[in-house]
């Protein structure tokens, strides 16, 4: 969403691909353009999913043309313009290569994801992870989520946090490593490069900091964040009529 541009950019930089969900009747929405522009800019090759194909007012042919025009207007590359299309109804629980079905589960979408997206690109070296989001948990404390760029991480491992300028923010030990399994987070013994994980144990590190092995001195370059949609400045009224209006 345009109101959360920074968060959108950080999330997109964790993924290897994207599924662009478009309503079969309404077509691309304003927020579709915003998020798609970000995805194309960093080189992602989206899968286009035409959803709600069961609506009586669906117009999938026109919507596909609108999506193609949107890609072209956003300066998509030839490879990005050659996007695969899948149709279906999330409400009814099916996806298929054809708008007419077969209406037999979500497997075609999952198969397309495996086929179309490249595996995670990993780097050699000790553990490094760029913090993408933070949250507070009543049991775990500060929870940092990000993608492991290189190396591996285990619970009770010593790490440090580097700010974007390379200064050490804090040093500590990881108390818990959580991996994502569907919509749930489950504790794991170890996470490796390419995994998206959540960790706890640090108290000061924040978004755009690099969590890394103690031997690392260079932080991961953080994605520039869009300026606010609206900015406001407040100052004390020190005019001659202050307090007299």
Label every model-predicted segment.
Residues 1-245:
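Structural and coupling elements of P-loop NTPases
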């Amino acid at each position: 969403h345009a109101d959360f541009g920074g968060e959108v950019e950080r999330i997109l930089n964790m993924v290897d691909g994207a599924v662009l969900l478009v309503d079969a009747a309404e077509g691309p929405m304003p927020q579709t353009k915003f998020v798609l522009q970000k995805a194309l800019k960093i080189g992602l090759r989206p899968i286009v999913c035409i959803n709600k194909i069961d609506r009586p007012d669906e117009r999938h042919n026109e919507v596909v043309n609108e999506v193609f025009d949107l890609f072209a207007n956003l300066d998509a590359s030839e490879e990005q313009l050659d996007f695969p299309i899948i149709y279906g109804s999330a409400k009814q629980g099916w996806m298929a290569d054809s708008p007419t079905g077969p209406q037999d589960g979500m497997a075609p979408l999952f198969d397309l994801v495996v086929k179309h997206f490249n595996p995670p690109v990993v780097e050699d070296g000790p553990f490094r992870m760029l913090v993408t989001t933070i949250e507070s948990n009543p049991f775990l404390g500060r929870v940092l989520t990000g993608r492991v760029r290189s190396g591996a991480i285990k619970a009770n491992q010593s790490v440090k946090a580097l700010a974007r300028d390379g200064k050490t923010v804090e040093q500590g030990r990881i108390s818990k490593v959580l991996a994502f399994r569907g919509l749930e987070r489950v504790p794991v013994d170890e996470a490796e490069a390419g995994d998206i994980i959540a960790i706890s144990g640090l108290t000061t590190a924040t978004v755009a900091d690099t969590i890394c092995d103690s031997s690392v001195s260079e932080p991961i370059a953080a994605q520039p964040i869009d300026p606010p949609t609206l900015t406001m400045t407040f100052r004390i009224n020190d005019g001659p009529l202050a307090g007299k209006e």
